[in-house]
Structure formats: structure tokens, C-alpha cells
Amino acid sequence: MELVSRPPTGWLSALAAGAIVSAAIAWLAPAQLVVFGLTLLLVALTGFAAVPLLRRWKARQFIREDGPRSHLKKAGTPTMGGIFFIPWALVVPFAFAGWNPELIAAVALATSYGLVGWIDDFQIIRRQSNNGITPRQKMLLLIGAGVAFCLFHGLSGHGTATFGLGELGILFWPLALLALTGTANAVNITDGLDGLAGGTGAIAATVLGLIVIATHPALAVLCFALAGACLGFLVHNRHKATVFMGDTGSLAIGGALAAVAVLSGQLVALALVGGVFVVEALSVIAQVGYFKATKGPDGKGKRLLRMAPLHHHFELGGLHETQVVARFYLAGASLALLTWWLHTGWPPSA
């Protein structure tokens, strides 16, 4: 009898991501399990009420026609799911860490980025098309919020944060703004498959929280709450997704991760643990750049990938959506382990 290889289900990938995150927190920061578990539960339960409301409000996703054909069946799935999981991720930490100034700053940045995403999602829904605010408008809004955040950072005496690279001085500004806007957009780009941004975001947030917990405990609480919120969202966003997070969710996740990294001086760690986001963003940049560089008089150019971002390249190569997500989870977990090893030297050499 011939055995047929079947792709993993959405539940299987989501449970694997949850097991990785839960085990890491239980082992290395058991006191934070309450924050993580409470946020996960609140988001999961809220989703059962929020998703039908989004469907009733006709907050429907519009699928790009030039994307994979298999995604056309997702048209009409509710979007803007960030409105029910991001608030829990940003509110719960205050119950455990109090009104810490750094926590307030990080939450304010994530909230402002989520608001930019909400404006984009709202315009898409209102116009009944896949065109929200323009990329230029979105970038200007993200930069504006980033500048305000950096002003707080500088005025509070952290403007010379090292990021593990030595004192930066005036270079703090461009590097911090690049991290804030770049991470937000990278997570946004990654959010193209069911459960992809949520699972990889949870893994990245967990390890970043473990890294900063000794020196910035309030920011660590935010990270663990964000991880719980992302996994709670997977209850509804795993394949086959009943809701998408939209820019409301993805920009807020990226903003929160970057804000924690900037405030704690851990941008190198962010780049490593968020390597999946970095590669996804670079795949788009490389695809566009190569196409323009090889464009002939007829206006046609060559492509490095079958389709960008990278997850679509693998889809068009024959992998099922859940197989791509599972592999990206594995890559995210491997990068998380590498980041933790570089940070702590664990496991010790013989």
C-alpha cells in the first residue's frame, strides 16, 4: 500500500510553535508563564466574538490578482484582526509591570504603528480594493511615530545606546529609525500565509524577552504578552484562517519588537532572532532590484524568484502553504536558539 505524504495541518504547526514558546518560558522564565498564558487565553476567547463581528462589518480581505492562484479562495476572509489581539498584548503588561516609562514608550510606539495599519486596513475595506494608503503615506506616518519615539529615547538619557556595536552617538537616530520602520514593514511582508507572522512573531518575542529580562524586566513582560497574544491569534489565524491580522496587527508586532530592541540596546539580537523577517524583506528588495537592473527596452526584466516574498517562491515551487509555514517556524526556532546561544554562551562547551 502506497503511503501518501500529507502536508501538516494548521493546528499541528500552531501547536508546535506554542510548544516551543511555552517550553522556553517555562524553563528560563517560569514566573512569566502567567503573563504569557493569560494573554494567550484572553486573545483566543476574544477572537470567538470578534471574528463574527468583523464578518458582519464586512471587513473583508481583498486578494492581489497577481499572487498565487491558490490564495484567491481566501478572498472575503475578515481582516483587521489586529484590533482584537494587539490591545491585549499592550494592556496586560501594565497589570504586571506597572507604569514603567520604557514600557509606556514601547506600547505607545506599537499603538501608533498599529493605528497606521488600521488606517490602511480601513481604506482597503472602504474602497473595496487592495489599495489602502500609499506606501509613501504609510512610510511617512511610520517615520513620524519613530521620530517621536526616538525623541523620548534621547531625552530619557538613552540616546547613546550601544546596541552591542560600541557608542553610536548621532548614528543612533538613523539606526533606530531603520530598525523601527524596517522591522514593522518586514513583519508586514511576512504576513502572507496563514499563521506565518503570528508564529514567527511569537518565537522572536519570546527570545527577545528572555534576553532583556535581567536588565529591562518591564520590556520582557511586554515581549511575553506579545508572544501569548500572537499564539492566541493563531487559534483563529492558523490554516485555514478565519481571520487575518491585517496591517493593524503586523505593523504593531514589528513596532513592539523594534521598540524593545531600541530601548534595551539589543538591535543585533533583533536582527538575528527576527531573521525570518529580514530574509523576507530582503527577498522583495532583491526581486525588485534585479528586475529593474535587467529591464530591457521592452520594459521586461528578469526575476530572481518565482514570486516575492520568499514564502510565495516556495509555494509556487510546489510546497503546500502549511509546509512553507512549518519550515519557516523551524527556521525561526533555529535562529532563536542561535541568538540565545550567542547571548549566553549556552550550552557551554565541553
UniProtKB/Swiss-Prot annotation:
Provide the catalytic activity annotation.
UDP-N-acetyl-alpha-D-muramoyl-L-alanyl-gamma-D-glutamyl-meso-2,6-diaminopimeloyl-D-alanyl-D-alanine + di-trans,octa-cis-undecaprenyl phosphate = di-trans,octa-cis-undecaprenyl diphospho-N-acetyl-alpha-D-muramoyl-L-alanyl-D-glutamyl-meso-2,6-diaminopimeloyl-D-alanyl-D-alanine + UMP
Q: Does the keyword Nucleotide-binding apply?
A: no
Biological processes per GO annotation: cell division; cell wall macromolecule biosynthetic process; cell wall organization; peptidoglycan biosynthetic process; regulation of cell shape
Principal localization?
A: membrane
Give the GO molecular function terms: metal ion binding; phospho-N-acetylmuramoyl-pentapeptide-transferase activity; phosphotransferase activity, for other substituted phosphate groups; UDP-N-acetylmuramoyl-L-alanyl-D-glutamyl-meso-2,6-diaminopimelyl-D-alanyl-D-alanine:undecaprenyl-phosphate transferase activity
Concerning Pfam families, the annotation shows: Glycos_transf_4, MraY_sig1
Q: In which pathway does it act?
A: Cell wall biogenesis; peptidoglycan biosynthesis
UniProt-listed PROSITE patterns: MRAY_1, MRAY_2
Q: Which family does it belong to?
A: Belongs to the glycosyltransferase 4 family. MraY subfamily.
NCBIfam families for the chain: mraY
Q: Give the function comment from the record.
A: Catalyzes the initial step of the lipid cycle reactions in the biosynthesis of the cell wall peptidoglycan: transfers peptidoglycan precursor phospho-MurNAc-pentapeptide from UDP-MurNAc-pentapeptide onto the lipid carrier undecaprenyl phosphate, yielding undecaprenyl-pyrophosphoryl-MurNAc-pentapeptide, known as lipid I.
Recorded protein name is Phospho-N-acetylmuramoyl-pentapeptide-transferase
